[in-house]
């Protein structure tokens, strides 16, 4: 009998990607986040689709339509809460997935890594335009502040900002186009995720040791399908706990007030997952400098593969690099905290020091640690 799984053109692709895929036998739970991100993306698209059925992208009715979804639509409150908190889970998984990639040297699969960075930027853009849609105070002022950064670009800045706005300020045209962007971008994310997977399957997965795993591989199914199913169950449990018991804990109270262009909130800040970048932006007193630092904080990820100096791929057996990695993690948590604080001392200086340390760690200290560890591994040491 011909095995359809291995011969059918479409089934064959699925089989080679999720069933008979040769996978290293020693990959840990840190390798679960790819599939969890896929699950998050599917949940977000489905919940978003149901929300879009009831949402109106008009400045006069957007806020009311979100209230209507939560009050009058069957299980609308649940769909809304899952979508809002699903974004937080998405970014949590994203940061852990990237952290894993840096720790275990997965960035040396350059194509996969670069597509991953483009994916991160696309997801960040999706989340930003999505945050504007409820048209609350923080939605409006967040959109105003962030889109205003475009005006810092020399010569074309103001024209570019007004082109994005569709007028002379954030208004009806901006909301309508942001809704259009928020609808289309997740499908671009799906396409990029498929390309990400395609490049990954060209090389095969990395593993915690960083050693070539070709001599010891096992089929993806049933071993890792079961493992992924467990991860997804735990993710769903965490999401439901957050959405049902504490749905507004990660949001901003200002967003419960309708957008008012005449009243600026005392502290304008984005959602928690953008706070680290926002802190870097604010740490430079110059507008253009801040914008460049903001861009550099994300785009620096693209040059991480070029800064790899160690003879070993993974940090598993490199204690100095490990220490620096965890300092970087603590530094990012510090930046996240600072991003949510008012612009006053001592927060200003802490933010500036943390921003400096962020770039110093990635550009200087970690490459130097790799060279030092190479030297320490020499027999004469």
Swiss-Prot record:
Binding, a ubiquinone: 201
Entry protein name: Cytochrome b
SUPFAM superfamilies xref list: a domain/subunit of cytochrome bc1 complex (Ubiquinol-cytochrome c reductase), Transmembrane di-heme cytochromes
Any further remark recorded for this protein: Heme 1 (or BL or b562) is low-potential and absorbs at about 562 nm, and heme 2 (or BH or b566) is high-potential and absorbs at about 566 nm.
Keyword Repressor: no
The species this protein was found in: Murexia habbema (Habbema dasyure)
Amino-acid positions noted as binding heme b b562 in the UniProt annotation, renumbered to this chain: 83, 182
Purpose of the protein: Component of the ubiquinol-cytochrome c reductase complex (complex III or cytochrome b-c1 complex) that is part of the mitochondrial respiratory chain. The b-c1 complex mediates electron transfer from ubiquinol to cytochrome c. Contributes to the generation of a proton gradient across the mitochondrial membrane that is then used for ATP synthesis.
């Amino acid at each position: 009998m011909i095995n359809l799984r291995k011969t059918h053109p479409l089934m064959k692709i699925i089989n080679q990607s999720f069933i008979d895929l040769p996978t290293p036998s020693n990959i840990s739970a840190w390798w679960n986040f790819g599939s969890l991100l896929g699950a998050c993306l599917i949940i977000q698209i489905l919940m978003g689709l149901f929300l879009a059925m009831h949402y109106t992208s008009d400045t006069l009715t957007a806020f009311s339509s979100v209230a209507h979804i939560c009050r009058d639509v069957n299980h609308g409150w649940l769909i809304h809460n899952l979508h809002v908190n699903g974004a937080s889970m998405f970014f949590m998984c994203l940061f852990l997935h990237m952290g894993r990639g840096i720790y275990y040297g997965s960035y040396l699969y350059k194509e996969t890594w670069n597509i991953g960075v483009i994916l991160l930027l696309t997801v960040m853009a999706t989340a930003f335009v999505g945050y504007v849609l409820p048209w609350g105070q923080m939605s409006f002022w967040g959109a105003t502040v962030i889109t205003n950064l475009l005006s810092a670009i020399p010569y074309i800045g103001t024209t570019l900002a007004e082109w994005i706005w569709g007028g002379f300020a954030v208004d009806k045209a901006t909301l309508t186009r942001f809704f259009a962007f928020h609808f289309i971008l997740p499908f671009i994310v799906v396409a990029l995720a498929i390309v990400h997977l395609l490049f990954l399957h060209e090389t095969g997965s990395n593993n915690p040791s960083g050693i070539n795993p070709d001599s010891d591989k096992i089929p993806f199914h049933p071993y890792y399908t079961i493992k992924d199913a467990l991860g997804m169950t735990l993710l769903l449990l965490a999401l439901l706990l957050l959405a049902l018991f504490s749905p507004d804990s990660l949001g901003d109270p200002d967003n419960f007030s309708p957008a008012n262009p005449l009243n600026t909130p005392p502290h304008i800040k984005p959602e928690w997952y953008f706070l680290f970048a926002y802190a870097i932006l604010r740490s430079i007193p110059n507008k253009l400098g801040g914008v460049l630092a903001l861009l550099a904080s994300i785009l620096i990820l693209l040059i991480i593969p070029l800064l790899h100096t160690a003879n070993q791929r993974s940090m598993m057996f490199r204690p100095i690099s490990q220490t620096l990695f965890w300092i970087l993690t603590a530094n990012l948590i510090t930046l996240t905290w600072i991003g949510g604080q008012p612009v006053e001392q001592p927060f200003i200086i802490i933010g500036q020091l943390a921003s400096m340390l962020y770039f110093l760690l990635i550009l200087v200290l970690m490459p130097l640690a790799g060279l030092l560890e190479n030297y320490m591994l020499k027999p004469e040491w």
